[in-house]
Amino acid sequence: MSETPVTVPFVSFRPMERELDADLRGAFARVLDNSWYIGGREDAAFEKAFADYCGVRHCVGCGNGLDALVLILKAMGIGPGDEVIAPSNTFIATVLAISYAGAAPVLVEPTLESYNIDPARIEAAVTPRTKAIMAVHLYGQCAPMDEINAIAHAHGLKVIEDAAQAHGATYKGRKAGSLGDAAGFSFYPGKNLGALGDAGCVTTDDDALAERIRALGNYGSDYKYHHIYKGQNSRLDELQAAFLAAKLPHLDAMNAERRRIAARYLAEMHNPAVTLPAELPGCTHVWHIFAVRCAARDALEKHLNARGIGTNKHYPTPIHLQGAYAELGLDRGALPLAEEISATELSLPMFYGMTDAQVQAVIDAVNEFEG
């Protein structure tokens, strides 16, 4: 009698939810019992815990990761007439934040080894209008922050971390979120530290910046009905803060499991048609995404899907070829490395609670592919 094939979803929250069921239900009950839903003790407790975790003085909760970046830019006074350097290979929210602040994005190519921005290309993109560098820690690995910070210091620029995919990642022993002037995090449910809905935060050591960000996210108010900025409504609600506080003590263990899965992938996948990702020296990769490259990407995806293995693409169309950014005037071929990644990248299953059989099924299917 033949064995039932092992199916592997691209992602599943079920193992984590089962393990933390009592904690999450307790968090919900606690918020309901308190009958306080915005700006209360749960928010304050999580902000302190996450600031301590990242090794910074301040964490300011907000509505989502995009808002976190927008609030940082606005609090820094970056807006119309200014330019912000950002990687060409990233999720569109990175660049949308720059646009929402009124500034202009300047896209710089990544390295194929790291998928992160190439510091060797940043200097040439700096102009008199440049005000900041947006350093994205893509897929869970920190950008080369020493080089980025050195360039920023030489030109008087701010450094903003987009840490939406890098909860718990480290660079030379320091946590993502503590490596620039400020960092934006997303707590979208699929993140390594995810809420049960949308949520985000900003981390920083800058006292004045944190105060401005908190006011900007609360209608520009420093105290009730007193508005010193033209702000917006972007706050971390009590329920999501309570859920995040329940999950945070488990983040390192969950990241360690992702690293264990990634280690097996890296050690046991040996298909010459598939280029595996790398953990760079000085970095602790938390493997939010396990991104491989394959010239026959679509065929590989079809092969894996036919075997019950879920996949995704991060990201199938680069920023400069999206209709939303036609204004940049960058045609196909303008940013060849971002285009190569978008045409060849495939994301393999990676989530807390994958069974050994599921991990083995992914490895076997990749190795069996004839590209």
Predicted segments with their positions:
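PLP-dependent aminotransferase class I/II
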Residues: 3, 14, 26, 41-48, ...
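Phosphate-binding glycine-rich loop
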Residues: 35-83, 96-101, 107-109, 174
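Short beta-strand-to-turn element immediately C-terminal to the catalytic PLP-Schiff-base lysine
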Residues: 185-186, 200-205, 245
